[in-house]
Amino acid sequence: MGTRIDGKKVAARTKADLAKRVELLKARGIQPGLGTILVGSDPGSVKYVAGKHADCAEIGVNSIKRELPENATFDQVADAVRQLNADPACTGYIVQLPLPRGIDENAIIDLIDPKKDADGMHPYNLGELVLHARGDITTPLPCTPRGVIELLRAYDIDLDGKEVCVLGRGITIGRTIGLLLTRKAVNATVTLCHTGTKDVRDHMRRADVIVAAMGVAGFVKPEDIKEGSILVDVGVSRVFDEESGRYKVKGDVDKACYEKAFAYTPNPGGVGPMTRAMLLQNVVEMAERQL
């Protein structure tokens, strides 16, 4: 059985460190604040946003909430974005996605002040990541890709020269994690697989590391991986469990793979907690840049 990479434990350590940094900021007269814009009342989105504000309270970051009805117009959402751009109490903020049908999400994200982009997904910040493959980056980083890399570092997993197979081309991780993995400081070789990839399982068998972000429950099987590989499971699917009569969250990696792996992230309990921790880290770093 491979090593279980505990995202909850690493996230807790990260938040403890951030709490100390927030205290130092407060001593210098800077109070970090995280804003959220929530449109509608989707249960998943409501729960996720509530979790972010609970995290804020845990480390001493103020919460700024903007809630709009399901039938909010583009202009109303845009106004909420502009208000947070102008609010000095808001260090950084996120627009909870997805937005209701008919609202152009990319157009809304474009309106975010890049310096307050807590998710690290503004085109300017992604462009900075593309342009600067070496040295320090002083713009916010995408939370989930950053969380994956920090999680592996916490377990002393060196990615230098490793073959990494990324499954899925979604913007949250699939298309963005390669930008971090191929930076000189990480130095991995990345293959991005998607629905148009031929012989995807051949790519998986060659990989030292698989980052699964397809949202297809149990897609990665034991016969698809080589002995001693590292499995990072980011996929999320809600699957009905007949035994319990309830829906359960399932990852993209079949648990039978754990026997062959050198290390693996459980799902849930792996990458998810680190994504939330990296959101806080972005906000604290934004505040520290004000010093």
UniProtKB/Swiss-Prot annotation:
<keyword id="KW-0028">Amino-acid biosynthesis</keyword>
<dbReference type="GO" id="GO:0005829">
    <property type="term" value="C:cytosol"/>
</dbReference>
<dbReference type="GO" id="GO:0009086">
    <property type="term" value="P:methionine biosynthetic process"/>
</dbReference>
<protein>
    <recommendedName>
        <fullName>Bifunctional protein FolD</fullName>
        <ecNumber>1.5.1.5</ecNumber>
        <ecNumber>3.5.4.9</ecNumber>
    </recommendedName>
</protein>
<keyword id="KW-0560">Oxidoreductase</keyword>
<dbReference type="Pfam" id="PF02882">
    <property type="entry name" value="THF_DHG_CYH_C"/>
</dbReference>
<comment type="pathway">
    <text>One-carbon metabolism; tetrahydrofolate interconversion.</text>
</comment>
<keyword id="KW-0511">Multifunctional enzyme</keyword>
<keyword id="KW-0368">Histidine biosynthesis</keyword>
<keyword id="KW-0658">Purine biosynthesis</keyword>
<comment type="similarity">
    <text>Belongs to the tetrahydrofolate dehydrogenase/cyclohydrolase family.</text>
</comment>
<dbReference type="GO" id="GO:0006164">
    <property type="term" value="P:purine nucleotide biosynthetic process"/>
</dbReference>
<comment type="function">
    <text>Catalyzes the oxidation of 5,10-methylenetetrahydrofolate to 5,10-methenyltetrahydrofolate and then the hydrolysis of 5,10-methenyltetrahydrofolate to 10-formyltetrahydrofolate.</text>
</comment>
<dbReference type="InterPro" id="IPR036291">
    <property type="entry name" value="NAD(P)-bd_dom_sf"/>
</dbReference>
<dbReference type="InterPro" id="IPR046346">
    <property type="entry name" value="Aminoacid_DH-like_N_sf"/>
</dbReference>
<dbReference type="GO" id="GO:0004477">
    <property type="term" value="F:methenyltetrahydrofolate cyclohydrolase activity"/>
</dbReference>
<comment type="subunit">
    <text>Homodimer.</text>
</comment>
<keyword id="KW-0378">Hydrolase</keyword>
<keyword id="KW-0554">One-carbon metabolism</keyword>
<dbReference type="GO" id="GO:0000105">
    <property type="term" value="P:L-histidine biosynthetic process"/>
</dbReference>
<dbReference type="GO" id="GO:0004488">
    <property type="term" value="F:methylenetetrahydrofolate dehydrogenase (NADP+) activity"/>
</dbReference>
<keyword id="KW-0521">NADP</keyword>
<feature type="binding site">
    <location>
        <begin position="168"/>
        <end position="170"/>
    </location>
    <ligand>
        <name>NADP(+)</name>
    </ligand>
</feature>
<feature type="binding site">
    <location>
        <position position="195"/>
    </location>
    <ligand>
        <name>NADP(+)</name>
    </ligand>
</feature>
<dbReference type="InterPro" id="IPR020630">
    <property type="entry name" value="THF_DH/CycHdrlase_cat_dom"/>
</dbReference>
<dbReference type="GO" id="GO:0035999">
    <property type="term" value="P:tetrahydrofolate interconversion"/>
</dbReference>
<dbReference type="InterPro" id="IPR000672">
    <property type="entry name" value="THF_DH/CycHdrlase"/>
</dbReference>
<keyword id="KW-0486">Methionine biosynthesis</keyword>
<feature type="binding site">
    <location>
        <position position="236"/>
    </location>
    <ligand>
        <name>NADP(+)</name>
    </ligand>
</feature>
<dbReference type="Pfam" id="PF00763">
    <property type="entry name" value="THF_DHG_CYH"/>
</dbReference>
<dbReference type="InterPro" id="IPR020631">
    <property type="entry name" value="THF_DH/CycHdrlase_NAD-bd_dom"/>
</dbReference>
